[in-house]
Amino acid sequence: IEQGAILEKNELINSNEFDGLSFDKAFEQIDKKAKKLKCGQRQVNYRLRDWGVSRQRYWGAPIPAVKNSKGDLQGAEDIPVVLPTEVKFSGVKSPLSEMEDFTKVSLEGEEFIRETDTFDTFFESSWYYARFASFDNDKAMLDERAKYWLPVDQYVGGIEHAVLHLLYSRFFYRCLRDLGLVEGSEPFLNLLCQGMVLKDGSKMSKSKGNIVDPNEVIDLYGADTLRLFVMFVAPPDQSFEWSEQGLQGASRYLNRLWNLVQDHLDSESKKELDFSDSSESVTTLRNKTHQTLSKVKDDFLRRHSFNTAIASIMELTNAIPKEFLSVNAKDFEKSSVREAINTILISLSPITPHITHALWNQLGNQNIIIDV
């Protein structure tokens, strides 16, 4: 206490009958006593915010309401409200407010003005994932296909959405559930919150002037190099500092991979892959190849640890003996190299699709590598 607050969940002290209890047990006992004394109860508090409607576009979701001459609001009867497409932009306010044929509404002999505000992008983003399942249905929000495809197996988004977008999405999904349009209560089965790319220790921002233009990087290094660097430098859920040295390292590896395939093509055996008579060094390389394939599959699909998957692929690249690339290498040695290279290219193809596809075709494969 004298040195600082105890931050860990530990045993309670100076708490009367709750002394000595662990945090979790004390929590349960205090909850029971509070209920018995009718002085409190357990409650979950969400970080709810008023929906600050912003980022509006005139073509956003219409607000189905009209105002009478007194300014009183009431619900519009002509639902859904269909927005006009022929509009003129003044650059000052919504073009809808200038269109009398849209704004003026007559209901039972009384004149009303239609609400010209629209909901913001959060309204659409709260259920867009569901609409993908019925994207071509212009008669309804969703159809039976939504029940097949939803809920979303894996959702990726920034942690900043935890108190806004992700909560709204759950509200919308449960509304869709109550309408019988989807099944279940949760829209996303798994969530991955990706980290940020930092520059000079802070989030990239135009106002701070620390932006790195990806187009300039692609022009200099190529898209595959940029993709490899971003996926290799850190786990996807952690932020990382932009590094020109790291980018150059990714470029060097891809150049090395290209040269590796060219060396193999120069020494390649035209025979079918045959390992019936192989040496201990061939067995070692083959074991490394299959271990890498198993690890990459687990890192990609279960752990979402792309950086460790790439590290394993690089280790396999380093494990190929130089003598196996010689013209004088034995056929089963060349076969083990081909097996290792195939594994490297297939494993890297989701990360660096362009160079791996080109090398895959150079090896005589006619199919598209991403489909292998």
Residue ranges and their predicted role:
Residues I1-D78, V87, K208, D213-G246, ...:
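Residue patterns forming the tRNA-binding/recognition surfaces of aminoacyl-tRNA synthetases
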Residues I13-N16, K33-L37, E144-E160, I211-N215, ...:
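Glycine- and acidic
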Residues I1-G4, I13-Q43, R47, E86-T121, ...:
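Basic, alpha-helical terminal appendages of large translation-related enzymes
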Residues D31, K35, W127, R131-S134, ...:
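Amphipathic, well-packed alpha-helical segments that form the structural scaffold of globular domains
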Residues A65-G75, P80-V81, L191, V197-L198, ...:
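Acidic, turn-prone loop/beta-hairpin segments
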Residues K35-R42, D136-L150, R174-P187, L220-Y221, ...:
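Secondary-structure transition/capping motifs at alpha-helix termini
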Residues I1, L96-M99, K104-P236:
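Alpha-helical recognition segments enriched in aromatics with Gly/Pro capping
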Residues W51-G60, R252-L260, V282-E323:
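Core structural elements
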